[in-house]
Amino acid sequence: STLLASSAASDVYKRQGAIEASAHKVLAIPHKNGKITAKAVKQYFADFYADGNHEHMVFPGMVYISHPTEYGTLYSKKELEELSIVCHEYDAPLYLDGARLGYGLVSEENDVTLADIASLCDAFYIGGTKVGALCGEAVVFPKNNAPKHFMTTVKQHGALLAKGRVLGVQFDTLFTDNLYFEISKNAIKTADTLKQALKEKGYTFY
């Protein structure tokens, strides 16, 4: 199977082909400022199934988005709802890359909550390193929908740490006393200072 992603997504042009190396092709679709639309995703699926040869073509099995995107843009709750509807229509999981999730959740321009993401996405991950963790991300299957034998698959791909407790301890700490969000707020505050300085120099923003 394969995944649909914005042509700006890091999994499309970075990662040394890691996705393809695990036998999952990445298909890039057009984006606007890093975001893909439900309309574009629906059109891709419609065109795929309308092709008489689709049984012989690469099957689009999942939709991948980032929030915030690689451009720093944010999906609105409405946009996530629309993407979720299309994904369910075509029985394709919606996966959200949350490497920068903390920044997105505390942004003044954001209207999406963690509960919204859990409700609208089939899987997502909460990034740790961009809020100070030494390593790792927390993968979340919000509907008790983890693939069967998920841990076995993780281990088969060399991704199970011998000292895995190190990951858990970090996230336990990050989600105690709102530390995860406080760190993210500080990052946004610092970024706003930089943004203002760049704005005064005549730069424009998304």
Where are these regions (language model features)?
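Active-site-proximal loop->helix
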Residues: K14-H24
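Active-site-proximal loop/turn and secondary-structure-junction residues that shape catalytic pockets
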Residues: T69, R100-G102, K130
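PLP-dependent aminotransferase-class I/II
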Residues: A23-G61, I65-P68, Y75-E82
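Catalytic PLP-binding core of fold-type I/II PLP enzymes
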Residues: Y75-S107
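Hydrophobic beta-strand scaffold residues
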Residues: V26-L27, L94-L96, F205
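Single conserved hydrophobic/aromatic residue that forms the stacking wall/gate
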Residues: T2-A9, Y13
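Short beta->alpha connector loops at strand-helix junctions that form conserved
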Residues: S7, A28-K32, G128, L161
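Active-site C-terminal subdomain of aminotransferase-like
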Residues: F59-S66, L74, V112-Y206
